[in-house]
Amino acid sequence: MSRHYEVVFLVHPDQSEQVPAMIERYKSLIEGGNGTIHRLEDWGRRQLAYPIQNLVKAHYVLLNIEVDQAVLSELVESFRFNDAVLRHLVVKRDGADTEQSLIMKSKDEKGDKPERSERRRRDDEEGEAPAANDNDGDNAEAA
């Protein structure tokens, strides 16, 4: 019987270039066992909440999958025997999560913002024009 799971695993930052190959290996393992991948997100290198093996950053990958217990056991076993995987977490879910995670949504929003130097230049240009009206008392954003 297939169930839905959310899987997050952390990869050693020195092994970040190996992550696409690892993802392909895990995808083939899941799909080879008649499983389904509903969502796959590569979050990239992120700050850890606490040091793991004297590391402060790790490469995060999120999977939402639908597999049976045998395939899940094989996947977890492959995490355990891969030295590059620092941590892994498997959580049983009620259904398939297919929409983008909050982390990826916030990453996309940050990606839409202009570069810092471009923002500063634009802010400087905007700051020169209304300089005469700075102290009129109507500007609540200045507080």
From Swiss-Prot:
GO terms for molecular function: small ribosomal subunit rRNA binding; structural constituent of ribosome. GO terms for biological process: translation. InterPro entries: Ribosomal_bS6 (IPR000529), Ribosomal_bS6_sf (IPR035980), Ribosomal_S6_plastid/chlpt (IPR020814), Transl_elong_EF1B/ribsomal_bS6 (IPR014717). It comes from the Bacteria. Residues 105-124 have a biased composition (Basic and acidic residues). Keywords: Ribonucleoprotein, Ribosomal protein, RNA-binding, rRNA-binding. Residues 98-143 are annotated as: Disordered. One of its GO terms (cellular component) is cytosolic small ribosomal subunit. CDD domains: bS6. PANTHER family: MITOCHONDRIAL 28S RIBOSOMAL PROTEIN S6, SMALL RIBOSOMAL SUBUNIT PROTEIN BS6M. Belongs to the bacterial ribosomal protein bS6 family. HAMAP family: Ribosomal_bS6. Binds together with bS18 to 16S ribosomal RNA. This is Small ribosomal subunit protein bS6. It comes from Xanthomonas euvesicatoria pv. vesicatoria (strain 85-10). The gene is rpsF.
